[in-house]
Amino acid sequence: MIPRHSLPFDVGTLFSVLIRSSSARLQSDVEKAYADALGVHKSLLLPSVRAGIHMAILAVSKSDTIVAGPAYTCGTVHVAMALSGAPTRLIDSGPGAFLMPSDGIYAATEPGCALVLSEVYGLSYDQELLRNACGKGPGLRILDMAMGIPDPGRTRKLEATDIALFSFGWGKPMYAGWGGIACFQDSELADRVRDIRDQWTVPETFGLRFRHGNSALIQTAMNHRSLYGLSHEPHLYRVLRKTASPSHEQGCQLKISGSLPPQWTSPMTPLNRQLALYNLRHSAQDAGLRRSQAEIYSGLLVESGAVRGPGSKELPQSHFPILLPSAVRDKMCDYLRGRGIDTGTLFPFPAGLSRDLYPRAAKTAGEVITLPLGPSITLDEVRMVSHRVKDGLQALGC
Protein backbone atom coordinates (compact mmCIF):
# COMPACT_ATOMS: atom_id res chain seq x y z
CA MET A 1 0.00 0.00 0.00
CA ILE A 2 1.23 3.51 -0.83
CA PRO A 3 1.50 5.40 2.51
CA ARG A 4 -0.26 8.72 2.98
CA HIS A 5 2.95 10.26 4.42
CA SER A 6 6.34 10.05 2.74
CA LEU A 7 9.45 10.13 4.93
CA PRO A 8 12.74 11.70 3.78
CA PHE A 9 14.73 8.55 4.66
CA ASP A 10 14.35 4.79 4.99
CA VAL A 11 15.21 2.33 7.77
CA GLY A 12 18.72 1.79 6.39
CA THR A 13 19.48 5.49 6.55
CA LEU A 14 18.02 5.71 10.03
CA PHE A 15 20.27 2.89 11.28
CA SER A 16 23.29 4.58 9.72
CA VAL A 17 22.41 7.82 11.48
CA LEU A 18 21.64 5.96 14.71
CA ILE A 19 25.17 4.52 14.77
CA ARG A 20 26.61 8.02 14.41
CA SER A 21 24.21 9.70 16.83
CA SER A 22 26.45 9.05 19.83
CA SER A 23 28.86 11.57 18.33
CA ALA A 24 26.17 13.98 17.17
CA ARG A 25 26.88 17.64 16.94
CA LEU A 26 25.75 19.92 19.71
CA GLN A 27 22.42 21.70 19.44
CA SER A 28 24.25 24.94 18.66
CA ASP A 29 26.13 23.29 15.78
CA VAL A 30 22.90 22.12 14.15
CA GLU A 31 21.36 25.56 14.61
CA LYS A 32 24.37 27.19 12.94
CA ALA A 33 24.25 24.71 10.04
CA TYR A 34 20.62 25.63 9.35
CA ALA A 35 21.24 29.37 9.76
CA ASP A 36 24.17 29.27 7.33
CA ALA A 37 22.33 27.15 4.75
CA LEU A 38 19.15 29.23 4.89
CA GLY A 39 20.78 32.65 4.99
CA VAL A 40 19.32 33.80 8.32
CA HIS A 41 21.03 35.41 11.30
CA LYS A 42 19.94 32.76 13.80
CA SER A 43 17.99 29.53 14.07
CA LEU A 44 16.74 27.70 17.15
CA LEU A 45 15.85 24.03 17.61
CA LEU A 46 12.48 23.58 19.30
CA PRO A 47 10.39 20.82 20.88
CA SER A 48 7.74 21.43 18.18
CA VAL A 49 6.30 24.08 15.89
CA ARG A 50 3.29 24.54 18.17
CA ALA A 51 5.68 25.38 21.01
CA GLY A 52 7.54 27.77 18.71
CA ILE A 53 4.35 29.62 17.80
CA HIS A 54 3.46 30.12 21.43
CA MET A 55 7.00 31.07 22.46
CA ALA A 56 7.13 33.64 19.67
CA ILE A 57 3.85 35.21 20.79
CA LEU A 58 5.07 35.35 24.40
CA ALA A 59 8.31 36.97 23.27
CA VAL A 60 6.50 40.04 21.87
CA SER A 61 3.26 40.11 23.87
CA LYS A 62 2.08 43.22 25.65
CA SER A 63 -1.13 43.80 27.56
CA ASP A 64 -2.97 44.94 24.43
CA THR A 65 -1.51 42.46 21.92
CA ILE A 66 -3.97 40.57 19.74
CA VAL A 67 -3.22 37.39 17.80
CA ALA A 68 -4.65 36.81 14.32
CA GLY A 69 -4.46 33.60 12.33
CA PRO A 70 -6.26 31.15 10.06
CA ALA A 71 -9.47 29.30 10.84
CA TYR A 72 -8.33 26.50 8.52
CA THR A 73 -5.17 24.96 9.94
CA CYS A 74 -3.96 22.26 12.31
CA GLY A 75 -5.78 22.36 15.64
CA THR A 76 -2.47 22.62 17.50
CA VAL A 77 -1.95 26.05 15.91
CA HIS A 78 -5.20 27.27 17.45
CA VAL A 79 -4.10 25.88 20.81
CA ALA A 80 -0.75 27.66 20.58
CA MET A 81 -2.50 30.94 19.74
CA ALA A 82 -5.07 30.63 22.52
CA LEU A 83 -2.60 29.60 25.21
CA SER A 84 -1.10 33.09 25.25
CA GLY A 85 -4.33 34.45 26.70
CA ALA A 86 -4.35 37.30 24.17
CA PRO A 87 -7.53 38.09 22.22
CA THR A 88 -7.59 35.89 19.11
CA ARG A 89 -9.04 36.74 15.72
CA LEU A 90 -9.47 33.90 13.25
CA ILE A 91 -9.63 34.57 9.52
CA ASP A 92 -11.68 32.53 7.07
CA SER A 93 -10.04 30.99 4.01
CA GLY A 94 -10.18 32.71 0.65
CA PRO A 95 -12.83 31.67 -1.90
CA GLY A 96 -11.79 28.29 -3.30
CA ALA A 97 -8.46 28.54 -1.48
CA PHE A 98 -6.64 26.83 1.39
CA LEU A 99 -4.92 30.01 2.63
CA MET A 100 -6.20 33.29 4.05
CA PRO A 101 -7.04 36.06 1.53
CA SER A 102 -5.14 39.34 1.63
CA ASP A 103 -8.27 41.40 2.36
CA GLY A 104 -9.13 39.12 5.28
CA ILE A 105 -5.64 39.52 6.72
CA TYR A 106 -5.78 43.29 6.31
CA ALA A 107 -9.16 43.54 8.04
CA ALA A 108 -8.15 41.36 11.02
CA THR A 109 -4.73 42.84 11.78
CA GLU A 110 -3.66 46.04 13.49
CA PRO A 111 -0.34 47.69 14.33
CA GLY A 112 1.65 45.64 16.83
CA CYS A 113 -0.42 42.46 16.55
CA ALA A 114 0.95 38.95 16.12
CA LEU A 115 -0.06 37.32 12.83
CA VAL A 116 0.16 33.56 12.27
CA LEU A 117 0.43 32.50 8.62
CA SER A 118 -0.03 28.74 8.30
CA GLU A 119 1.18 27.45 4.94
CA VAL A 120 -0.95 24.29 4.97
CA TYR A 121 0.36 21.42 2.81
CA GLY A 122 3.41 23.59 2.09
CA LEU A 123 1.39 26.03 -0.05
CA SER A 124 3.14 29.39 0.18
CA TYR A 125 1.74 32.90 0.44
CA ASP A 126 2.49 35.24 -2.43
CA GLN A 127 5.05 37.63 -0.93
CA GLU A 128 3.86 40.75 -2.76
CA LEU A 129 0.24 40.16 -1.83
CA LEU A 130 1.32 39.41 1.73
CA ARG A 131 3.26 42.66 1.91
CA ASN A 132 0.13 44.59 0.90
CA ALA A 133 -2.05 42.57 3.28
CA CYS A 134 0.27 43.42 6.18
CA GLY A 135 0.16 47.14 5.46
CA LYS A 136 -0.98 47.89 9.03
CA GLY A 137 2.36 46.65 10.34
CA PRO A 138 1.96 43.54 12.52
CA GLY A 139 4.54 43.51 15.29
CA LEU A 140 5.26 39.84 14.57
CA ARG A 141 4.66 37.60 11.57
CA ILE A 142 4.87 33.90 12.37
CA LEU A 143 5.33 31.94 9.15
CA ASP A 144 4.11 28.47 10.08
CA MET A 145 5.92 26.44 7.41
CA ALA A 146 5.55 23.19 9.34
CA MET A 147 4.41 21.31 6.24
CA GLY A 148 7.05 22.76 3.93
CA ILE A 149 10.71 22.33 3.04
CA PRO A 150 13.11 25.21 3.81
CA ASP A 151 13.91 27.33 0.76
CA PRO A 152 16.94 29.64 1.13
CA GLY A 153 15.43 31.90 -1.52
CA ARG A 154 12.53 32.63 0.84
CA THR A 155 14.24 32.53 4.21
CA ARG A 156 16.89 35.06 3.14
CA LYS A 157 14.04 37.53 2.58
CA LEU A 158 12.65 37.24 6.10
CA GLU A 159 12.25 40.59 7.82
CA ALA A 160 13.16 41.55 11.37
CA THR A 161 9.60 40.95 12.58
CA ASP A 162 9.36 37.51 10.93
CA ILE A 163 9.82 34.03 12.36
CA ALA A 164 9.78 31.03 10.01
CA LEU A 165 9.00 27.66 11.60
CA PHE A 166 9.64 24.21 10.11
CA SER A 167 8.53 20.92 11.65
CA PHE A 168 10.53 17.72 12.10
CA GLY A 169 7.42 15.91 13.36
CA TRP A 170 5.46 12.96 11.98
CA GLY A 171 4.05 13.26 8.48
CA LYS A 172 6.12 16.33 7.60
CA PRO A 173 8.58 16.48 4.65
CA MET A 174 11.43 17.28 7.07
CA TYR A 175 10.52 14.48 9.53
CA ALA A 176 13.37 13.77 11.95
CA GLY A 177 11.45 11.91 14.64
CA TRP A 178 10.82 14.94 16.82
CA GLY A 179 11.07 18.71 17.04
CA GLY A 180 11.22 21.74 14.81
CA ILE A 181 13.32 24.78 14.02
CA ALA A 182 12.75 28.54 14.01
CA CYS A 183 14.58 30.95 11.69
CA PHE A 184 15.18 34.63 12.48
CA GLN A 185 16.75 37.67 10.89
CA ASP A 186 16.55 39.60 14.17
CA SER A 187 19.00 38.35 16.80
CA GLU A 188 17.27 40.11 19.69
CA LEU A 189 13.95 38.41 18.93
CA ALA A 190 15.75 35.07 18.60
CA ASP A 191 17.37 35.58 22.01
CA ARG A 192 14.00 36.28 23.65
CA VAL A 193 12.54 33.10 22.19
CA ARG A 194 15.64 31.14 23.24
CA ASP A 195 15.23 32.31 26.83
CA ILE A 196 11.65 31.00 26.88
CA ARG A 197 12.68 27.72 25.26
CA ASP A 198 15.47 27.17 27.77
CA GLN A 199 13.08 27.80 30.68
CA TRP A 200 10.60 25.23 29.36
CA THR A 201 12.88 22.51 28.05
CA VAL A 202 13.42 19.43 30.22
CA PRO A 203 16.86 17.77 30.51
CA GLU A 204 17.94 15.35 27.79
CA THR A 205 18.08 11.98 29.57
CA PHE A 206 18.93 8.45 28.45
CA GLY A 207 15.24 7.58 28.75
CA LEU A 208 14.30 10.46 26.46
CA ARG A 209 16.89 9.38 23.90
CA PHE A 210 15.57 5.81 24.02
CA ARG A 211 11.93 6.89 23.57
CA HIS A 212 12.73 9.18 20.65
CA GLY A 213 14.90 6.54 19.00
CA ASN A 214 12.30 3.82 19.52
CA SER A 215 9.58 6.07 18.11
CA ALA A 216 11.55 7.02 14.99
CA LEU A 217 12.54 3.41 14.31
CA ILE A 218 9.00 2.02 14.61
CA GLN A 219 7.41 4.85 12.64
CA THR A 220 9.96 4.54 9.83
CA ALA A 221 9.73 0.75 9.65
CA MET A 222 5.94 0.71 9.69
CA ASN A 223 5.81 3.30 6.91
CA HIS A 224 7.49 0.82 4.55
CA ARG A 225 5.01 -0.57 2.04
CA SER A 226 5.59 -4.17 3.06
CA LEU A 227 4.36 -3.38 6.58
CA TYR A 228 2.19 -0.32 6.06
CA GLY A 229 -1.06 -2.06 5.22
CA LEU A 230 -0.65 -4.48 8.13
CA SER A 231 0.31 -1.74 10.56
CA HIS A 232 -2.87 0.17 9.71
CA GLU A 233 -5.25 -2.67 10.51
CA PRO A 234 -7.42 -1.08 13.23
CA HIS A 235 -6.41 -3.18 16.26
CA LEU A 236 -2.70 -3.33 15.47
CA TYR A 237 -2.62 0.33 14.48
CA ARG A 238 -3.78 1.43 17.94
CA VAL A 239 -1.07 -0.66 19.61
CA LEU A 240 1.69 0.54 17.29
CA ARG A 241 0.63 4.16 17.54
CA LYS A 242 0.82 4.02 21.31
CA THR A 243 4.18 2.22 21.23
CA ALA A 244 5.68 4.53 18.62
CA SER A 245 4.63 7.73 20.34
CA PRO A 246 7.35 9.13 22.61
CA SER A 247 4.64 10.84 24.64
CA HIS A 248 0.93 10.77 25.28
CA GLU A 249 -0.48 14.24 24.81
CA GLN A 250 -3.91 14.87 26.25
CA GLY A 251 -5.49 16.82 23.41
CA CYS A 252 -5.66 20.51 24.14
CA GLN A 253 -5.38 20.24 27.92
CA LEU A 254 -2.02 21.95 28.05
CA LYS A 255 -1.65 22.86 31.66
CA ILE A 256 -2.09 20.05 34.14
CA SER A 257 -0.84 20.85 37.63
CA GLY A 258 1.37 23.56 36.15
CA SER A 259 3.06 21.23 33.64
CA LEU A 260 3.12 21.13 29.86
CA PRO A 261 3.00 18.05 27.60
CA PRO A 262 6.25 16.78 26.03
CA GLN A 263 5.49 18.39 22.64
CA TRP A 264 6.10 21.69 24.40
CA THR A 265 9.07 20.77 26.56
CA SER A 266 11.07 17.78 25.24
CA PRO A 267 14.28 18.68 23.37
CA MET A 268 15.56 17.02 20.23
CA THR A 269 18.00 14.18 20.94
CA PRO A 270 21.28 13.40 19.11
CA LEU A 271 19.42 11.07 16.72
CA ASN A 272 16.84 13.76 15.93
CA ARG A 273 19.59 16.31 15.35
CA GLN A 274 21.52 14.00 13.03
CA LEU A 275 18.36 13.28 11.03
CA ALA A 276 17.64 17.01 10.83
CA LEU A 277 21.11 17.54 9.33
CA TYR A 278 20.55 14.68 6.89
CA ASN A 279 17.28 16.30 5.80
CA LEU A 280 18.95 19.67 5.35
CA ARG A 281 21.56 18.17 3.02
CA HIS A 282 18.87 16.48 0.91
CA SER A 283 16.16 19.16 1.12
CA ALA A 284 16.67 20.63 -2.36
CA GLN A 285 16.49 17.17 -3.96
CA ASP A 286 13.34 16.26 -2.00
CA ALA A 287 11.70 19.59 -2.83
CA GLY A 288 12.41 19.06 -6.53
CA LEU A 289 10.88 15.59 -6.49
CA ARG A 290 7.75 16.77 -4.69
CA ARG A 291 7.41 19.69 -7.10
CA SER A 292 7.53 17.32 -10.09
CA GLN A 293 4.93 15.05 -8.51
CA ALA A 294 2.64 17.97 -7.66
CA GLU A 295 2.86 19.20 -11.25
CA ILE A 296 1.61 15.81 -12.45
CA TYR A 297 -1.31 15.79 -10.00
CA SER A 298 -2.18 19.36 -10.93
CA GLY A 299 -2.10 18.69 -14.66
CA LEU A 300 -4.03 15.42 -14.60
CA LEU A 301 -6.59 16.29 -11.94
CA VAL A 302 -6.96 20.05 -11.43
CA GLU A 303 -6.19 21.63 -14.78
CA SER A 304 -8.19 18.91 -16.51
CA GLY A 305 -11.22 19.94 -14.46
CA ALA A 306 -11.64 16.57 -12.73
CA VAL A 307 -11.32 18.03 -9.21
CA ARG A 308 -10.64 21.32 -7.45
CA GLY A 309 -7.19 21.84 -5.97
CA PRO A 310 -3.90 23.72 -6.32
CA GLY A 311 -3.00 24.90 -9.80
CA SER A 312 0.46 24.75 -11.31
CA LYS A 313 1.37 28.17 -9.88
CA GLU A 314 0.73 27.17 -6.25
CA LEU A 315 2.25 23.74 -5.74
CA PRO A 316 2.16 22.04 -2.30
CA GLN A 317 5.01 20.10 -0.70
CA SER A 318 3.75 17.77 2.02
CA HIS A 319 0.65 16.31 0.32
CA PHE A 320 -1.44 17.20 -2.70
CA PRO A 321 -4.89 18.36 -1.51
CA ILE A 322 -7.95 17.93 -3.69
CA LEU A 323 -11.53 18.93 -2.96
CA LEU A 324 -14.57 16.74 -3.59
CA PRO A 325 -18.21 17.12 -2.51
CA SER A 326 -18.44 16.21 1.17
CA ALA A 327 -21.04 13.52 0.39
CA VAL A 328 -18.47 11.46 -1.53
CA ARG A 329 -15.21 12.49 0.17
CA ASP A 330 -15.03 9.55 2.58
CA LYS A 331 -16.25 7.14 -0.09
CA MET A 332 -13.37 8.23 -2.32
CA CYS A 333 -10.90 7.60 0.52
CA ASP A 334 -12.32 4.08 0.91
CA TYR A 335 -12.23 3.54 -2.86
CA LEU A 336 -8.56 4.50 -3.08
CA ARG A 337 -7.61 2.50 0.00
CA GLY A 338 -9.20 -0.56 -1.56
CA ARG A 339 -6.80 -0.07 -4.46
CA GLY A 340 -3.70 0.24 -2.31
CA ILE A 341 -3.55 4.01 -1.89
CA ASP A 342 -3.83 5.53 1.58
CA THR A 343 -5.02 9.13 1.80
CA GLY A 344 -5.73 11.68 4.53
CA THR A 345 -8.43 14.23 5.35
CA LEU A 346 -6.47 16.95 7.13
CA PHE A 347 -7.72 19.20 8.66
CA PRO A 348 -11.00 18.62 10.54
CA PHE A 349 -13.01 21.72 11.38
CA PRO A 350 -12.62 22.51 15.10
CA ALA A 351 -15.67 21.56 17.14
CA GLY A 352 -15.64 24.86 19.04
CA LEU A 353 -15.76 27.11 15.98
CA SER A 354 -18.88 28.45 14.29
CA ARG A 355 -19.39 27.18 10.76
CA ASP A 356 -21.44 30.31 10.09
CA LEU A 357 -18.51 32.58 10.94
CA TYR A 358 -15.99 30.57 8.91
CA PRO A 359 -18.04 28.95 6.13
CA ARG A 360 -15.20 28.50 3.64
CA ALA A 361 -12.89 26.87 6.19
CA ALA A 362 -15.71 24.55 7.27
CA LYS A 363 -16.49 23.64 3.66
CA THR A 364 -12.85 22.88 2.87
CA ALA A 365 -12.47 20.75 6.00
CA GLY A 366 -15.36 18.55 4.87
CA GLU A 367 -14.18 18.19 1.28
CA VAL A 368 -10.39 17.81 1.36
CA ILE A 369 -8.46 14.63 0.54
CA THR A 370 -4.67 14.62 0.67
CA LEU A 371 -2.82 12.53 -1.92
CA PRO A 372 0.73 11.27 -1.25
CA LEU A 373 3.86 13.14 -2.33
CA GLY A 374 7.54 12.41 -1.75
CA PRO A 375 10.14 9.63 -1.94
CA SER A 376 7.64 6.88 -1.06
CA ILE A 377 5.88 7.23 -4.42
CA THR A 378 7.30 7.30 -7.95
CA LEU A 379 6.28 9.65 -10.76
CA ASP A 380 4.58 6.77 -12.58
CA GLU A 381 2.64 5.95 -9.42
CA VAL A 382 1.54 9.57 -9.13
CA ARG A 383 0.04 9.22 -12.60
CA MET A 384 -1.57 5.95 -11.54
CA VAL A 385 -3.08 7.56 -8.43
CA SER A 386 -4.45 10.40 -10.57
CA HIS A 387 -6.16 7.91 -12.87
CA ARG A 388 -7.53 5.99 -9.86
CA VAL A 389 -9.08 9.23 -8.60
CA LYS A 390 -10.74 9.74 -11.97
CA ASP A 391 -11.95 6.13 -11.95
CA GLY A 392 -13.34 6.68 -8.47
CA LEU A 393 -15.20 9.80 -9.55
CA GLN A 394 -16.87 7.82 -12.30
CA ALA A 395 -17.67 4.90 -10.00
CA LEU A 396 -19.18 7.24 -7.40
CA GLY A 397 -21.26 9.05 -9.99
CA CYS A 398 -19.47 12.39 -9.75
Regions found by a protein language model. Give the residues of each.
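Residue-level detector of anion-binding/catalytic polar loops
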Residues: 87, 140, 341-342
